[in-house]
């Protein structure tokens, strides 16, 4: 389904994909293989950053939508590796917070490359805000942020082929759900309380059943990141990388 949406962007299939990414972990993805392919894509798309001695940091000199999109993919893929470990350890609050970060990064990729190589005013503003947060300047950054609703709307348009209010509202609900983990909401904190032992499982929820249930979210996150990578490769005309990434979906039986 995701493969056909990336190629055709039909509205009906786009809606199914958004629901599938939200609710099911239907395809296993080997995270080590995914990491290799996404790093290969990164190297082909934007190359290596340059060492800036005076800042003691690596930086990309090309400040474009392409570079930001690929770096957002890097962040999302790193997050998938992290939630895999957190889920296995039963650390569900931080697990949920990172899922929100992954979802945001994936949405931003589609927003950035929706009209590539053209960029809208909102995309230009997003790029300026992104690069304003450099190693030496992040504390003084005053660049306004692009509203998140505009970013998620672009995500829906790319997958559905048009504006779809129902799909947008679904993404809004997902956003609000996982925002609770970041903002330490009451209900999300109470999820980890064990009434039998009268403690909050500060070293992780021990229940294997609970861990297995949440591992479905790792599947969903891995799939969404993998196909964001395929979208980048297709948009940039990297045919080899696009084919390799899409093939991984069909050849990987398990997640880890």
Please place each PLM-identified region on the residue numbering.
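A cross-kingdom marker of C-terminal helix-rich interaction/assembly modules
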Residues: 1-105, 109-256
